[in-house]
Swiss-Prot record:
Family, per entry: Belongs to the bacterial ribosomal protein bL9 family.
Protein's job: Binds to the 23S rRNA.
UniProt-recorded name of the protein: Large ribosomal subunit protein bL9
GO MF annotations, alphabetized: rRNA binding; structural constituent of ribosome
Statement: the UniProt record of this protein carries the keyword Ribonucleoprotein: yes
Listed SUPFAM superfamilies: L9 N-domain-like (SSF55658), Ribosomal protein L9 C-domain (SSF55653)
Family annotation (PANTHER family): 50S RIBOSOMAL PROTEIN L9
A Gene Ontology cellular-component term: ribonucleoprotein complex
Superkingdom, taxonomy of origin: Bacteria
């Protein structure tokens, strides 16, 4: 019997997959527990529509990420920090501070965990901070660190 998996079933199939399984297994386990539906022409057509919609949504996410990358390349974020002698910072500028400054100055919300800045910024001046906007799209934020 051909079934369409509605959930991942370990060792048997993943969600959205169409597979041939024994009739007893399908009727007594998969269909009964709503892990799968029978692969009728109507259900197959519905599956194709869902896959097409998911692909369009994914494409839209990529387009949005590319637009955000373009926006980020044209702006600069200014972050102020306390400094000591010789322009050395007390502590460092973190991704949290950069995300907050980006939100207040340009009304752009980016999760601090998407910024690749493992040790923070330890000096005054300009720094380019890489940002993972999507699995396929990566941009940079230009951060200007100034004295407080």
């Amino acid at each position: 019997m051909k079934v369409i998996f509605t959930q991942d079933v370990k060792g048997k199939g993943k969600k959205g997959e169409v597979k041939e399984v024994p009739v007893g297994y399908a009727n007594n386990f998969l269909l009964k527990k709503n892990y799968a539906v029978e692969a009728t022409p109507g259900n197959l057509k519905q599956l194709e529509l869902q896959k097409k919609r998911a692909k369009q949504e994914r494409q839209q996410e990529i387009e949005d990420a590319k637009a955000l990358k373009e926006t980020l390349s044209n702006i600069e974020v200014e972050v102020s920090a306390k400094t000591g002698e010789g322009g050395k910072l007390f502590g460092s500028v973190s991704t949290k501070q950069i995300a907050e400054a980006l939100k207040t100055q340009h009304d752009i919300k980016i999760d601090k965990r998407k910024m690749d800045l493992p040790n923070g910024i330890h000096s005054l001046g300009y720094t380019n901070v890489p940002v993972k906007l999507d699995k396929e799209v990566e941009g940079t934020i230009r951060v200007h660190t100034v004295e407080q």
